[in-house]
């Protein structure tokens, strides 16, 4: 059993294997192992610059840490008898650099600020991964929308045929939704990207450390202002989980529709075989399993958010060990989301939309009735509610032909539409879905000309977001270069 250098002074006796296993976060901490090494490097560089550690000790520690960064941590660092990766790395450093040098690394900090910093660094990386995958999904939607600006299909409310629209209009509706997800994730990044390092247990330290310097080395925008806030609060995790839950909920919605569209009684889309399975007994089956699993994954991410909120709701200031159990919820939410996004992008990119069926269904269920009511308002100055009642009654009577519409108009409004010049030919023209779509003039409507412009706008917005994402990655690379330069100046 490994000796616990942290318990050594205050506590006596050995822990049982069950206690060690129960308390250890080592498995989840694999997510932050590399971040921890970088935090240690930045901390040692700062200690040396502030003359809080001698040059020989700094060189021993940095040599060992750079070796871990290049070759990976030795397995001993992940010893499950240790409470966490931070203790594991410290023990490994003491073994590799000696007890004198290794014992100096923790000067001016606590595991509390150390873990909070590592969590923010790893969350930052995973947010960038999510954003990159989200860009790909949005691009797939924009590309398919560009192909289908004139593809007519029915729009639905309450899952009932409602009004004609275009496939581009539908696809760009989801792109807009995912664009807002992008905005939320960018916003979350700004609140993640602040440094707790140097806050120590919660009350800071009496050593003259430079928190701004370590923040700069690690790519943070600035140090957190309140040392208690820095170590005690995980609202950045809750916010990130909330954003991921919203994103996965939006993903679940489009999954649900694509599943429905792929059914034999809708036939709007044929999914690529790679994303489907067949039955073990029914040889004719083609099941949209990938979309179904993706729909289920959204429930898991929502569950991670619920668990996180429940976990932190009663925690007093400042640090509590409960927070250790928060981290796996974040990692799992990222894992489910970041697997789902590229798969959904592929599914949409390879989907075959059944344009003839969509066009045929576009007029089922009197989807064009609204336009006839609008026409009566425009041409004959009939109040909209009256026109609405006329057309609604005609639908109830079974047809929107001239005789029925005229008869209902006489009954409800004491108006003869025939005498005002309405003809059967005019009604047919008004009710044609192509005419209806061209008639749309309001911003954001499915008019094909507007859809072509909307595709360009969406594409520009995506490029702008991609540039912002590139800037975030450049900032992290620049910080890494600054840290490398500082290491070189020590002449290891």
Swiss-Prot record:
Record HAMAP family: Arg_succ_lyase (MF_00006)
The EC number(s) this enzyme carries: 4.3.2.1
Catalytic reactions on record: 2-(N(omega)-L-arginino)succinate = fumarate + L-arginine
Family annotation (NCBIfam families): argH
Protein's UniProt name: Argininosuccinate lyase
Alphabetized UniProt keyword annotations: Amino-acid biosynthesis, Arginine biosynthesis, Cytoplasm, Lyase
Subcellular location: Cytoplasm
Taxonomy, superkingdom: Archaea
Keyword Amino-acid biosynthesis attached: yes
Family under the similarity heading: Belongs to the lyase 1 family. Argininosuccinate lyase subfamily.
Alphabetized InterPro entries for the sequence: Arg_succ_lyase_C (IPR029419), Argininosuccinate_lyase (IPR009049), Fumarase/histidase_N (IPR024083), Fumarate_lyase_fam (IPR000362), Fumarate_lyase_N (IPR022761), L-Aspartase-like (IPR008948)
Gene Ontology BP term (one): arginine biosynthetic process via ornithine
TM regions (residue ranges): none
MF (Gene Ontology): argininosuccinate lyase activity
An annotated GO cellular component: cytosol
CDD domains named among the record's database cross-references: Argininosuccinate_lyase
Pfam family, one: Lyase_1
Protein species of origin: Methanocorpusculum labreanum (strain ATCC 43576 / DSM 4855 / Z)
Keyword field contains Aminoacyl-tRNA synthetase: no
Pathway assigned in UniProt: Amino-acid biosynthesis; L-arginine biosynthesis; L-arginine from L-ornithine and carbamoyl phosphate: step 3/3
């Amino acid at each position: 059993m490994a000796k616990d250098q942290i318990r050594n002074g205050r506590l006596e006796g050995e822990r049982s294997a069950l206690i060690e296993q129960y308390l250890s976060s080592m498995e989840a901490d694999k997510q932050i192992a590399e971040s921890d090494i970088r935090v240690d490097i930045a901390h040692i560089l700062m200690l040396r610059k502030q003359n809080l550690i001698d040059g020989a000790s700094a060189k021993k520690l940095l040599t060992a840490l750079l070796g871990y960064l290049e070759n990976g941590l030795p397995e001993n660092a992940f010893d499950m008898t240790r409470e966490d990766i931070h203790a594991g790395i410290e023990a490994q450093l003491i073994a590799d650099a000696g007890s004198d040098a290794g014992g100096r690394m923790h000067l001016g900090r606590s595991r509390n600020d150390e873990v909070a910093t590592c969590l923010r660094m790893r969350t930052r990386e995973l947010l960038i991964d999510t954003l990159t995958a989200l860009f790909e999904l949005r691009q797939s939607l924009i590309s398919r929308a560009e192909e289908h600006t004139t593809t007519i299909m029915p729009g639905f409310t309450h899952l009932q045929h409602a009004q004609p629209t275009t496939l581009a209009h539908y696809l760009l509706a989801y792109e807009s939704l995912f664009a807002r997800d992008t905005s939320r994730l960018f916003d979350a990044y700004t609140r993640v990207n602040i440094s707790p390092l140097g806050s120590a247990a919660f009350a800071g330290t009496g050593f003259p450390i430079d928190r701004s310097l370590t923040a700069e080395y690690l790519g943070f925008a600035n140090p957190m202002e309140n040392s208690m806030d820095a170590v005690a609060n995980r609202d950045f995790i809750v916010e990130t989980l909330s954003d991921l839950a919203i994103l996965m909920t939006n993903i679940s919605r489009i999954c649900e529709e694509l599943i429905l569209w792929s059914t034999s009684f809708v036939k709007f889309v044929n999914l690529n075989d790679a994303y489907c399975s067949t039955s073990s007994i029914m040889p004719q089956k083609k099941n949209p399993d990938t979309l179904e699993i993706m729909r289920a994954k959204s429930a898991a991410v929502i569950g991670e958010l619920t668990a996180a909120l429940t976990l932190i709701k009663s925690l007093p200031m400042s640090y509590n060990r409960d927070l250790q159990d928060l981290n796996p919820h974040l990692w799992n939410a990222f894992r489910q989301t970041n697997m789902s996004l590229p798969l959904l992008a592929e599914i949409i990119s390879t989907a075959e939309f059944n344009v003839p069926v969509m066009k045929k269904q576009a007029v089922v269920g009197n989807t064009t009735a609204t336009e006839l009511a609008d026409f009566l308002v425009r041409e004959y100055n009939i109040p909209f509610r009256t026109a609405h009642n006329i057309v609604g009654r005609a639908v109830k009577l079974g047809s929107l032909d001239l005789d029925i519409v005229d008869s209902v108009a006489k009954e409800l409004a004491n108006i003869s539409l025939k005498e005002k010049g309405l003809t059967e030919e005019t009604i047919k023209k008004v009710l044609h879905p192509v005419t209806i779509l061209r008639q749309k003039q309001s911003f954001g409507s499915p008019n094909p000309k507007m859809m072509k412009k909307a595709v360009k706008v969406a594409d520009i917005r995506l490029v702008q977001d991609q540039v912002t994402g590139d800037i975030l990655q450049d900032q992290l690379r620049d910080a890494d270069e600054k840290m490398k330069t500082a290491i070189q100046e020590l002449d290891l």
